Curated annotation (Swiss-Prot):
Protein name, entry field: Solute carrier family 22 member 20
Annotated function: Organic anion transporter that mediates the uptake of estrone sulfate. Inhibited by probenecid, propionate, 2-methylbutyrate, 3-methylbutyrate, benzoate, heptanoate and 2-ethylhaxanoate. May act as an odorant transporter.
Expression sites by tissue: Highly expressed in olfactory mucosa. Weakly expressed in testis. Not detected in heart, spleen, lung, kidney or brain.
Name of the gene this protein is made from: Slc22a20
A molecular function (GO) term: organic anion transmembrane transporter activity
Membrane topology annotation: Multi-pass membrane protein
Residue ranges annotated as Cytoplasmic topological domain: 1-15, 159-166, 216-225, 272-339, 388-397, 447-457, 507-556
Glycosylation site list: N39, N54, N61, N96
Keyword Glycoprotein: yes
Gene3D superfamilies: MFS general substrate transporter like domains (1.20.1250.20)
Single biological process term from Gene Ontology: organic anion transport
Short name of any one Pfam family annotated for the protein: Sugar_tr
Keywords from the named record: Glycoprotein, Ion transport, Membrane, Transmembrane, Transmembrane helix, Transport
Amino acid sequence: MAFTDLLDALGGVGRFQLVYTALLLLPCGLLACHTFLQNFTAAAPPHHCQHPANYTEPTTNVSGVWLRAAIPLNQHGDPEPCRRYVEPQWALLKPNASSHGVATEGCKDGWVYDRSIFPSTIVMEWDLVCEARTLRDLAQSIYMSGVLVGAALFGGLADRLGRKAPLVWSYLQLAVSGAATAYVGSFSAYCVFRFLMGMTFSGIILNSLSLVVEWMPTRGRTVAGILLGFSFTLGQLILAGVAYLIRPWRWLQFAVSAPFLVFFLYSWWLPESSRWLLLHGKAQQAVQNLQKVAMMNGRKAEGERLTTEVVSSYIQDEFASVRTSNSILDLFRTPAIRRVTCCLMGVWFSNSVAYYGLAMDLQKFGLSIYLVQALFGIIDIPAMLVATTTMIYVGRRATVSSFLILAGLMVIANMFMPEDLQTLRTVQAALGKGCLASSFICVYLFTGELYPTEIRQMGMGFASVNARLGGLVAPLITTLGEISPVLPPVSFGATSVLAGMAVACFLTETRNVPLVETIAAMERRVKQGRSKRDTEQKSEEISLQQLGASPLKETI
């Protein structure tokens, strides 16, 4: 008997599973706010050099004659953001005047920013423009570095300490570091706290998904995994609305961080995974948790009959194979695990590269940043509805593979779209982003189902590490556009297509298949599958031989 049979006996997808899933997915939704927050808090508005200290700058009419005399214009007729005339050139106000040969200099006295849309951002506060413009991207890279470190750290800790402890700590760390970020007075301190915030991303996402999957019967796992994607989509829509209402970056930062204190407080009620407790010799606590589940699901009588012996019998065959400690090498220890791990490394990396390459720089589309953020969030809804349907009725492997290949083709096709068709290019990019978001959430669930319970968190943590590496590489690939504009879209699209092909060729289907508890059980399942296929193949060969022999005998 499998552990999922016990969950079915205690109510299946009952009230406990619904409440538990909702309480875990709500924080996951707000994580999207932090991931894409710098689209708003680090937005770079139009700007130009501040005038010399001995020059009196009018307080109104920033596009008036004084600006034409003090700031050179670029090829589009806009003020140069990083240069100014050494001396005001009033002669340029005359018709047909030329600025050729006029001496210019850098912005020695700072910058003037257009505050009509953003009253304050970190770019304005610390002048992250011109020579310092790379620091803006550095801050986001540091956040993604934190996500990378968190994936490596929390994945291993969760398999050793349980799912709940790292999750509770991550809520607290994000609440504190997020609020502290809103009060820092220097860019270096801002980066430190952004790093700490990034670490919690993996701690929350990975442990929330594992808890949902491990408390959910087989028939409810697909919908639960897709709901995680919808929560992330909801978070992007919330960010667009909150950022539109709260424009100052410090208040916006605080607004999306404070709710995690509430999540920290109620997370103490969340029970630990009984699967993990049983596999680590804590059967009594597992029984207590299961009895609470039974009571909440209206199966109090069934819960009272539970004992440690009864509960342990559901995974008794697995206890003999459980290792008391695990290491990263366990992800490569056996052929079946090694095949899954190597394939997922490429899939997570490729998905992340393409996803963040599209979603982390909304200003490049030339439309309202709030509108683009909302569009990039809304597009996930129909995409995930399709993903939900195909995952339930077709399977995980076909769904993930199809979305990755489709997204890659759309990203490549986008580079052939004329640049003056900004709206059409944005819509096409949004469709590609929707496919990538759907494949992302599908592969989260797929990965959790592919790995056995004893190393599930470590496997998901390691896979997430590869995704974070992709997030770090994405900005570097974007810079290849300075060499050739076709390199970034080709790189993003090609990696996505290759990842989709790898899923189709090397991973097995997990739809309606009970979760595997140990590495040994996974190896047995793979061997049994091969034996069954070999038997079927031999039967077909014998049948074909007999079919071919009959006419020959009749002829003779």
